[in-house]
Each structure stands twice: as structure tokens, then as C-alpha cells.
Amino acid sequence: MSEVGQHIESLIKNGGYCQSDIAREIGVHRQSLSYIIAGRRELSMPLALKLESFFNLHEGELLKKQAEERVRYYKQKLKSELVERLLEVNAFWSYAGISAEDISDDELIEKVFIHLDLADIAKLFELYQRDFIRKVWKDKMVIQGDYLFNLNVMIALFYFNIKRPEKYLRQVEREHFKKLVDHA
């Protein structure tokens, strides 16, 4: 059952109605309402507006819930696909029985940059905000110095439009070492 379906069902129960009563009141087939509640059919604009009117909800509330649920589902699917691709290239060789839920966002971003291709990297920008990806890249990868230097130059130029990437990378690395020395 979808979240929207659960919400509609709770509104029906809390109001002391049954699906047949609501369907009759708003002029739709009970089976259509049942399919939406069960999550087997998407909520249409006219039906959403009728339900919102009947239950005195804000306009767009049900459609917003439906859209948010679809975005969440899409992002979970995308993350699972990226983890699957990483498993195919043996990026998690030291892990046993790993799933998408086990991988932190930081680790996923780092592994995708290191092990996967441009098309997969582009998917990161659908999953996460650009600033978050840049922060993870800067905190986890840039500080590794020469080990990932060429990759980091490409990432700096291609994804973050950094004009002088070599200088930028050296500066971030120096700042990181300075922090380590100051806190030692």
C-alpha cells in the first residue's frame, strides 16, 4: 500500500466512512478508489481534488504526497542500481552480503567516482545535491593527494567547473595537513 493510499484510508476510517460512501459522495467508482488506496493505481488530478475537497485538505496535499513518494522510490531504485554496478566491478570486495541500505551516502559517492563511468557518476547528481557531492569529494578524495590526483583533476574540471584544478587540489590538501598538524 502506498503512503497516499494509507493516508486516504486513515481519513476514511477517522471520519467514520467506508470506501463506498466516499466513492458515492465524490462520484467515482468504488473500485477506482480501492485501487488507489491499495497502491495499484496513481491518484489523478480530478480525483485528488475531489478527495481534498471532501476531507477539507489543502489543495495539492495528496498529489504532493504522491510525488514525494515517487521521488523517494526513484532515488532508492537509483541507489540500488549504483550499488549493484559497484558490486559488479568488485568495489566492495572486503564486504560480505552488502546491500544499498548498508552503504553510507559518503561511501557511495566516493566509490562511484573511483570505480564507475561518467554515466553512473551523472546519476549521483540525481540522488544528491551538488554541494553535498562536492563536500564529500573534497573531504574524502581530494585529501588523498597523488593517489587520486588525475581523477580529482578531471572531477574538478568536469563536475565542479574549477578553473585551475591543480592549484585548487594542492591548496585543499595543504589546508587538510595544516588542520591535522594544528590539532595534533
Q: Where are the regions that the model predicts?
A:
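A short, Lys/Arg-rich alpha-helix, primarily the initiator
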Residues: M1-Y17
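The alpha-helix within a helix-turn-helix
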Residues: I12, A23, E52
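Residue-level detection of the helix-turn-helix DNA-binding "recognition helix"
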Residues: K13, G27, A38-R40, A67
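Short alpha-helical DNA-recognition segment
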Residues: Y17-Y35
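DNA major-groove recognition helix of helix-turn-helix/homeodomain DNA-binding modules
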Residues: P46-E61
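Short amphipathic recognition helices of helix-turn-helix/homeodomain-type DNA-binding modules
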Residues: E61-L78
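Mid-protein regulatory/catalytic core that forms ligand/cofactor-binding pockets
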Residues: A96, E101-E175
